[in-house]
């Protein structure tokens, strides 16, 4: 190779040639070593080299030819060449990416296409569609081990088919769940029926666990729970060797469903009634003997039908006609909802899901809720209706006890039962009678033939929409008929599950009778369901209670529906005794309502002036007259109170006995009391008082008079409380009513107290007398008590109090609102001490026991009631002895009456309740009485009837508190004494109630109320008379000072100035009289400036809301507005803003902040502000239901104008 030396020198020529090569080796000169090369050879070499250069120095990328190595290298290293190279690479990469993406897309498309093809292939492979998988239905299949955990509790033997022995395992698993999804998952909970031939059945009876397909079909446009429409059908793996095992559609709607066949021990529990049944029935049908697949399928179809219509809860006797209806297994108990439409007649056409759909999903809910008892009752009714022939004569009778008893009733399929079912699916046997299909009910054609059902069209090709519309139209008519028949029934619960839907369930006539009390059969079923859920297997009483509870819930759901008494009367045959009681109760109610109407008329005459105060009241009165009549004869609990009405219905039946007594007592007393409180009592029973209840009825929007009647009849404290409250509310101004109504649903009792407060303010003087009567009567019954609280307060208000009727209403409303929780509880307890157990009276069973109120009542309470009535006069005399009587007659004598009544009531309570009697004895201290007298005088002078009303209201408030007030409360002598031991333990709300009156030191007008209740209510006078509050007491600000804005200046003038109150009003707290407070509250000096400003507001609030004082106190405590006063310290001058922590925490919920807004100055204790001993508050938290803000429009909201406080004394 030639070696070139690059020599840069002058020897280089411009053309690159060397001039002279000197000393430079340029390679071999010649081959032969000759320094001189041939020219020709040399030229050849050069040419060749040039060609090589051209070939070697050509840039393809740039398409450039270089002849010299150096130039070529320079080009390759140039930016131009590099840039082109990058561009080329980028293009290449982009191209590669594009190609790859396209390839991937293509691959994906191919995969999708393959998937589609596979899907199509799979779909094509699926030759069989699950029944009900048509356009309306979507189905899924779940496999469940059939015999898993098979427990055969009851055996249903088909007497007709002796060959076949069905062993149904009923697994009663307590489930409130209404979802049947778990049923499919849980073979135990699911009703699994394994039908096996004799050959294989006995051997593999507990061994083989065949998979059963559960088809859960839901109408696409129906809001249905899984269990309601789920249809469980069995897939038979071995037709020859093994009887086709099928599982009844398993739903967790366990109900007391009994497969009624020839053997009385055979009972099939259907899980239809999830909520009601404590256990989902798992029934396994095995064919111990050679069992025809058809029969097994019939049973399964029946079971399925039962399961499917669990929503409907219709106890239809399913005649699964494996043997041409010979083996009709009435699963009515099991399947209250539906009957299996097997080629036999389908007795449960009324159970059809469509019917449910027409009624509402509520129906479904109620059906699920229906308990075994309800289903049993329905079955009994069904039998009674003779719509189904019962092969077992004892079947219908045993059905009622079927909850506990295993009743086998074989019902012959009947044509009348062969009505179109309303269920979305009907278990039917295929033409070969080998498979039980869940066939869409729309597609079923009922015939008079033995199979009675024909289905041929492919569900996928079936036009469900058109048929469903027609069916709904047809079904609605039967529903009306059923409703009519149901309405004839006494108990709402009688047919909780019965045919609410259509007459087509004549086979379900029993159910119709039971469940279709009202057109809202849904509501009835709901009631029944709830009841059933409460006691699926419990006795009839339990069922009744549950039904009432359920009725309340159902009533809520079916507010749009009105219950008539006949509807309510409808009760399941299972609850025949209840029905009888209900009938008696209803009869009693009718008589009672008549008497009440008369009394109401009298009271209305008395109250017309007051009721005329507001047009709304008059309107309410007019409506109430209608509502009252309707309510008396028709249970029309509308909306909010319907749930209460349900409970009240239970209570009404239970408490009717005790209530009639109280009514009679109240009648006699009413005559004495101008029948005012009695009217109110009766009205309260029916719907508070007509004047108020009518308004209240309207206001309550379906807290119908019937519901009120129910509550009253039931002697339900709550219902009464609601009624009274509604009455008060109606009597109150519409604004207050609206507030109360807003709170009505949430705090029926609280609002009730408020309403009472208003009414009492309106009619305080009248109520004074009535209330005295009422006190004696209230001992008889909660009703009387509540009514006393109700009207007497209105009456208690002196005629002069009518000057500020609205304010008193507000006051009472506030007081009641405050004390309402306590009042509710108190009323329950005070309900002639049934209340104490009438707290339990909330329980329907307790309500039933309410007849035995006195028995339930502690002996002290019973004595207390009697004593209250007797001691009312005695205590009046005592009051004359007590300084309370010193209250000048300036109070229009009503105050004296109130004092007398209050004292008597208090003393009665004291005597009744020895634990509190000590406090009561010490309660009427001379100083307190003097203060009370002064206060009373000033009230009379100022005609501060509102204040008087407040004291009157205070007893009601005290009553309210008594329910929640614990024994240990230092509170009211009457309260403590009157409260039974149980009552004494109640929350300090009672204290608040009592103390509100004490703190205000208003004339003890509330004595009337206290006397009226005669139970645990301490009259303001007695409270004030001793004024012996514990050394640590809480001042409770009244709730609605806004209401006081409307109060005339007169009222404010009556409010003590801080100095006057502090100087002249000193409470002596006798230590012996009152138990020492659990936690001493430090006295906080109250700024007089604050006193002047907030005292006005608070004072009016207190005056207007003694009844609501408890609720307000709780709210205030929650808001931290309570103030602690040393008993000996001047109230207003020394009351500082109480630290919120110092006061016991009252769970007032959102009300507290509204009552006591932060911007408000610390409330000053007005003369009438209740004083709550710390011991009372601390021992137990005051549990106030969350009071609606409307009820308490910010207790301490700053007053736009502060009326100068004038010395009260």
UniProtKB/Swiss-Prot annotation:
InterPro entries: ZnF-G_patch_domain, Znf_C2H2_sf, Znf_C2H2_type
Record's GO cellular component terms: cytoplasm; dendritic microtubule; dendritic shaft; dendritic spine; growth cone; neuronal cell body; nucleus; plasma membrane
Composition skew (Basic and acidic residues), residue ranges: 380-394, 826-836, 848-860
Record PROSITE patterns: ZINC_FINGER_C2H2_1
GO biological process: positive regulation of dendritic spine maintenance; positive regulation of gene expression; positive regulation of neuron projection development; regulation of neuron projection development
Zinc finger extent (C2H2-type): 57-81
Record region (Disordered): 380-401, 792-860
Entry GO MF terms: zinc ion binding
Keywords from the named record: Metal-binding, Zinc, Zinc-finger
Basic residues bias: start-end ranges: 807-819
PANTHER family: ZINC FINGER PROTEIN 804A, ZINC FINGER-CONTAINING
Name of the featured protein: Zinc finger protein 804A
Organism: Homo sapiens (Human)
């Amino acid at each position: 190779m030639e070696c070139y030396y690059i020599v840069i020198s002058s020897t280089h020529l411009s053309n690159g040639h060397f001039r002279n090569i000197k000393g430079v080796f340029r390679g071999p000169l010649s081959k032969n070593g000759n320094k001189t090369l041939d020219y020709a050879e040399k030229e050849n070499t050069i040419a060749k080299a040039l060609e090589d250069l051209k070939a070697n120095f050509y840039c393809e990328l740039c398409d450039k030819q270089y002849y010299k190595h150096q130039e070529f290298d320079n080009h390759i290293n140039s930016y131009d060449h590099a840039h082109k190279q990058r561009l080329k690479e980028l293009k290449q990469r982009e191209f590669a990416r594009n190609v790859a993406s396209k390839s991937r897309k293509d691959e994906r498309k191919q995969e999708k296409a393959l998937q589609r093809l596979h899907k199509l292939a799979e779909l094509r492979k699926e030759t069989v569609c699950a029944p009900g998988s048509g356009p309306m239905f979507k189905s899924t299949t779940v496999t469940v081990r059939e015999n898993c955990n098979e427990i055969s509790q009851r055996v249903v033997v088909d007497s007709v088919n002796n060959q076949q022995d069905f062993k149904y395992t009923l697994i009663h698993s307590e489930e409130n769940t209404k979802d049947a999804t778990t049923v499919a998952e849980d073979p135990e909970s699911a009703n699994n029926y394994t039908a096996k031939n004799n050959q294989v059945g006995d051997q593999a009876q507990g061994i083989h666990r065949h998979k059963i397909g559960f088809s859960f079909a839901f109408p696409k446009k129906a809001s249905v729970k899984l269990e309601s429409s789920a249809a469980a059908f069995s897939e038979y793996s071995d037709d020859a060797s093994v009887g086709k095992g099928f599982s009844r559609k398993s739903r967790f709607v366990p109900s007391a469903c009994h497969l009624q066949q020839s053997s009385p021990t055979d009972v099939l529990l259907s899980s239809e009634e999830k909520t009601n049944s404590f256990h989902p029935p798992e029934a396994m049908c095995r064919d111990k003997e050679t069992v025809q697949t058809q029969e097994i399928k019939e049973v399964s179809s029946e079971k399925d039908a039962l399961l499917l219509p669990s929503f409907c809860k219709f106890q239809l006797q399913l005649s699964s006609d494996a043997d041409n209806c010979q083996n009709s297994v009435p699963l009515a108990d099991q399947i209250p909802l539906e009957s299996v439409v097997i080629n036999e007649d389908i007795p449960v056409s009324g159970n059809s899901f469509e019917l449910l759909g027409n009624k509402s999903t509520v129906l479904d809910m109620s059906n699920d809720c229906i308990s075994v008892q309800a289903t049993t009752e329905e079955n009994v009714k069904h039998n009674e209706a003779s719509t189904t022939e019962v092969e077992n004569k004892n079947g219908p009778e045993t059905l009622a006890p079927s909850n506990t008893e295993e009743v086998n009733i074989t019902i012959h399929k009947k044509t009348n039962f062969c009505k179109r079912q309303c269920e979305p699916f009907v278990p039917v046997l295929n033409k070969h009678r080998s498979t039980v299909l869940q066939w869409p009910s729309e597609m079923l054609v009922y015939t008079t033939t033995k199979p009675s059902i024909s289905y041929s069209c492919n569900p996928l090709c079936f036009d469900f929409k058109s048929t469903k519309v027609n069916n709904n139209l047809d079904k609605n008519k039967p529903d009306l008929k059923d409703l009519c028949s149901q309405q004839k029934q006494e108990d709402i619960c009688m047919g909780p599950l019965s045919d609410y839907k259509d007459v087509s369930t004549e086979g379900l006539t029993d159910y119709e009778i039971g469940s279709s009390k009202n057109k809202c059969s849904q509501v009835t079923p709901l009631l029944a369901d709830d009841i059933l859920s409460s006691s699926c297997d419990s006795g009839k009483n339990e069922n009744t209670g549950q039904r009432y509870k359920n009725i309340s819930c159902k009533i809520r759901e079916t507010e749009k529906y009105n219950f008539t008494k006949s509807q309510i009367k409808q009760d399941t045959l299972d609850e025949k005794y209840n029905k009888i009681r209900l009938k008696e109760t209803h009869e009693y109610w009718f008589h009672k309502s008549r008497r009440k109407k008369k009394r109401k008329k009298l009271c209305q005459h008395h109250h017309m002036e007051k009721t005329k105060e507001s047009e709304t009241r008059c309107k309410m009165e007019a409506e109430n007259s209608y509502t009252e009549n309707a309510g008396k004869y028709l249970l029309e609990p509308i909306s909010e109170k319907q749930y209460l009405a349900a409970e009240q219905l239970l209570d009404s039946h239970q408490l009717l006995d005790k209530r009639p007594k109280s009514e009679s007592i109240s009648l006699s007393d009413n005559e004495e009391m101008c029948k005012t409180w009695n009217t109110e009592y009766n009205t309260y029973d029916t719907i508070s008082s007509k004047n108020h209840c009518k308004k209240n009825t309207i206001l309550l929007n379906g807290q119908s008079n019937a519901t009120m009647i129910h509550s009253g009849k039931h002697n339900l404290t709550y219902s009464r409380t609601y009624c009274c409250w509604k009455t008060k509310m109606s009597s109150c101004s519409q604004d207050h009513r609206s507030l109360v109504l807003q709170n009505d649903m949430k705090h029926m009792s609280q609002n009730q107290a408020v309403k009472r407060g208003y009414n009492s303010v309106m009619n305080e003087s009248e109520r004074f007398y009535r209330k005295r009567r009422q006190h004696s009567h209230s001992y008889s019954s909660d009703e009387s008590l509540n009514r006393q609280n109700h009207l007497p307060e209105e009456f208690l208000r002196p005629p002069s109090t009518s000057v500020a009727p609205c304010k008193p209403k507000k006051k009472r409303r506030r007081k009641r609102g405050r004390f309402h929780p306590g009042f509710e509880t108190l009323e329950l307890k005070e309900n002639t001490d049934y209340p104490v157990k009438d707290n339990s009276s909330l329980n329907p069973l307790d309500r039933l026991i309410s007849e035995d109120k006195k028995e339930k009542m502690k002996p002290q309470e019973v004595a207390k009631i009697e004593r209250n009535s007797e001691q009312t006069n005695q205590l009046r005399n005592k009051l004359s002895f007590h300084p309370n009587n010193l209250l000048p007659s300036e109070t229009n004598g009503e105050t004296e009456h109130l004092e007398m009544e209050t004292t008597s009531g208090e003393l009665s309570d004291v005597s009744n309740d020895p634990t509190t009697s000590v406090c009561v004895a010490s309660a009427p201290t001379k100083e307190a009485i003097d203060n009370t007298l002064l206060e009373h005088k000033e009230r009379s002078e100022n005609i501060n009837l509102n204040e008087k009303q407040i004291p009157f209201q205070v007893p009601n408030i005290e009553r309210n508190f008594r329910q929640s007030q614990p024994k240990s409360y230092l509170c009211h002598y009457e309260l403590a004494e009157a409260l039974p031991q149980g009552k004494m333990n109640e929350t300090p709300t009672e204290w608040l109630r009592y103390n509100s009156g004490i703190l205000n030191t208003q004339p003890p007008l509330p004595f009337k109320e206290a006397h009226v209740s005669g139970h645990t209510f301490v009259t303001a006078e007695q409270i004030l008379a001793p004024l012996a509050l514990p050394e640590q007491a809480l001042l409770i600000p009244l709730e609605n000072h806004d209401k006081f804005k409307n109060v005339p200046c007169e009222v404010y003038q009556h409010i003590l100035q801080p100095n006057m109150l502090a100087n002249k009003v000193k409470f002596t707290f006798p230590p012996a009289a009152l138990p020492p407070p659990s936690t001493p509250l430090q006295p906080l000096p109250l700024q007089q400036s604050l006193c002047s400003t907030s005292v006005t507001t608070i004072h009016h609030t207190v005056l207007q809301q003694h009844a609501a004082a408890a609720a307000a106190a709780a709210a205030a405590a929650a808001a931290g507005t309570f103030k602690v006063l040393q008993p000996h310290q001047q109230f207003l001058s020394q009351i500082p803003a109480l630290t919120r922590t110092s006061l016991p925490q009252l769970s007032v919920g959102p009300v507290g902040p509204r009552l006591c807004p932060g911007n408000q100055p610390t409330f000053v204790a007005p003369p009438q502000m209740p004083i709550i001993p710390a011991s009372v508050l601390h021992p137990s938290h005051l549990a106030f239901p969350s009071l609606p803000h409307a009820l308490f429009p910010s207790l301490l909201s700053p007053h736009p104008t502060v009326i100068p406080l004038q010395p009260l004394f």
